[in-house]
Amino acid sequence: CPCGRRRCCVRGLNVYCCF
């Protein structure tokens, strides 16, 4: 994932950057 230093979180079918 293009999250930079943040890790990638997966929730169901959504993939996003962890806050």
UniProtKB/Swiss-Prot annotation:
Keyword Ligase (UniProt): no
Protein's job: May have microbicidal activities. May inhibit corticotropin (ACTH) stimulated steroidogenesis and the microbial actions of the corticostatins.
A single GO cellular-component term on record: extracellular region
Keywords linked to the UniProt accession: Antibiotic, Antimicrobial, Defensin, Disulfide bond, Secreted
Family: Belongs to the alpha-defensin family.
Location of this chain's protein in the cell: Secreted
The protein, known as: Corticostatin-related peptide LCRP
Domain of life: Eukaryota
Span of the signal peptide: none
Predominant location: secreted
Disulfide bridge positions per record: C1-C18, C3-C9, C8-C17
Keyword Disulfide bond appears in the UniProt entry: yes
GO terms of biological process kind: defense response to bacterium
Source organism of the structure: Petromyzon marinus
